[in-house]
């Protein structure tokens, strides 16, 4: 090889071609109202109790596993802790997918890391877009299962906010029996705990559930997530996880967050976010520039605007950072708004209220659409 060869040519072809996931922090911005990453808006306070930093931590910190298992109503051998749910997404691909042979399947519009993780490992992407109501297209999924080893379904779905019909989830699990793992991403399940499918683990050996402390637990900066599955799957994932996925301080704070007091505080945050979401949803429907607000079971709202690009820039210029969803299938003119404090929600409405609607053939009945939610 010539000494002048560009070192990037040594990289795998799929990595050279990869477009990385554009996280909120990568996209940047200079705002003071950050409503683009589905974080809790206020910092939580913890004091470190573990002070032994000269030793490596446990691979699976015992207290964290015990407390999360109790919280989820599962046995400890059904729980794995990792660096965020994102690592759980990757661990499943590492354990179950042969590069250049197997495929994963997901249903856009949805979370972008499923695609990025698969592309990183050279695993084929198989997409089956959701129907107009953002529910699963079961016949299309059934027709697309050849060589699929993993199916990722986000419920509540990011960025749309809707729950996936439980009957459809069961149908996918049945279709995939003996051929694919079905991973249900429950990152936002604390905002609708009654919709969790964790109790289904006893019935479906191919079911995996992804969880996180980043949302309702207000610990996005901690990078701590969980994979829930039957013990056979957990043992496989333990073969491919890093030897020390959680640092000692992370495990310390995670255990505190899962204590009885930590769980009580989490539920108080959920109640507060839910109230602010209802307020923001009602207020958005009165804004002339808003065509539609979609019902959400999470800590964000998706709204369709008459001219989302100008709305996005107007708020950006005022230090209010939202998440543009225009590039997602079926989400033209849509912006996702994280539920912030009441004051932050009020700032959003104050910035939107003066903006005009658009009178054009494509925006007829805008006034009536604004009164609707889906």
Swiss-Prot record:
Organism ancestry: Bacteria, Pseudomonadati, Pseudomonadota, Gammaproteobacteria, Enterobacterales
CC cofactor: pyridoxal 5'-phosphate
Quaternary structure and partners: Homodimer.
The enzyme's E.C. designation: 2.6.1.9
Superkingdom classification of source: Bacteria
Cited InterPro entries: Aminotrans_II_pyridoxalP_BS, Aminotransferase_I/II_large, HisP_aminotrans, PyrdxlP-dep_Trfase, PyrdxlP-dep_Trfase_major, PyrdxlP-dep_Trfase_small
Record protein name field: Histidinol-phosphate aminotransferase
Sequence similarity: Belongs to the class-II pyridoxal-phosphate-dependent aminotransferase family. Histidinol-phosphate aminotransferase subfamily.
Source organism: Yersinia enterocolitica serotype O:8 / biotype 1B (strain NCTC 13174 / 8081)
Listed Pfam families: Aminotran_1_2 (PF00155)
Residues with PTM N6-(pyridoxal phosphate)lysine: 215
Keyword Transferase applies: yes
């Amino acid at each position: 090889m010539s000494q002048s060869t560009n070192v990037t040519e040594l990289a795998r072809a799929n990595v050279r071609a990869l477009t990385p996931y554009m996280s909120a922090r990568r996209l940047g911005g200079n705002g003071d109202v950050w409503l683009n990453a589905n974080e809790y808006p206020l910092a939580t306070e913890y004091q470190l109790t573990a002070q032994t930093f000269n030793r490596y931590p446990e691979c699976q910190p015992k207290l964290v596993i015990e407390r999360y298992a109790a919280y989820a109503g599962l046995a400890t051998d059904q729980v794995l802790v990792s660096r965020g749910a994102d690592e759980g997404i990757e661990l499943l691909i590492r354990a179950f997918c042969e590069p250049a042979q197997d495929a994963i399947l997901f249903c856009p519009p949805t979370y972008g890391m499923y695609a990025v993780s698969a592309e990183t490992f050279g695993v084929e992407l198989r997409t089956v877009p959701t129907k107009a109501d953002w529910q699963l297209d079961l016949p299309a999924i059934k027709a697309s299962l050849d060589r699929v080893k993993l199916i990722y379904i986000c419920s509540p779905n990011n960025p749309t906010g809707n729950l996936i019909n439980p009957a459809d989830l069961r149908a996918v699990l049945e279709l995939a029996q003996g051929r694919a793992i079905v991973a249900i991403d429950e990152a936002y399940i604390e905002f609708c705990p009654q919709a969790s499918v964790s109790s289904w683990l006893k019935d479906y050996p191919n079911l995996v559930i992804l969880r996180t402390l980043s949302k309702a637990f207000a610990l996005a900066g901690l990078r701590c997530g969980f994979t829930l599955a039957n013990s056979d799957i957990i043992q496989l994932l333990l073969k491919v996880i890093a030897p020390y996925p959680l640092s000692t301080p992370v495990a310390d704070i995670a255990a505190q967050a899962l204590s009885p007091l930590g769980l009580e505080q989490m539920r108080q945050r959920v109640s507060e976010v839910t109230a602010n979401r209802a307020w923001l949803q009602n207020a958005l429907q009165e804004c002339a520039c808003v065509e539609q607000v979609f019902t959400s079971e999470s800590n964000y709202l998706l709204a369709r605007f008459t001219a989302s690009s100008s709305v996005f820039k107007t708020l950006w210029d005022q230090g209010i950072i939202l998440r543009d969803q225009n590039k997602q299938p079926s989400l033209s003119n849509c912006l996702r708004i994280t539920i912030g404090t009441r004051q932050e929600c009020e700032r959003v409405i104050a910035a939107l209220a003066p903006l005009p609607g658009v009178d054009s053939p494509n925006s007829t009945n805008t006034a009536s659409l604004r009164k609707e939610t889906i």
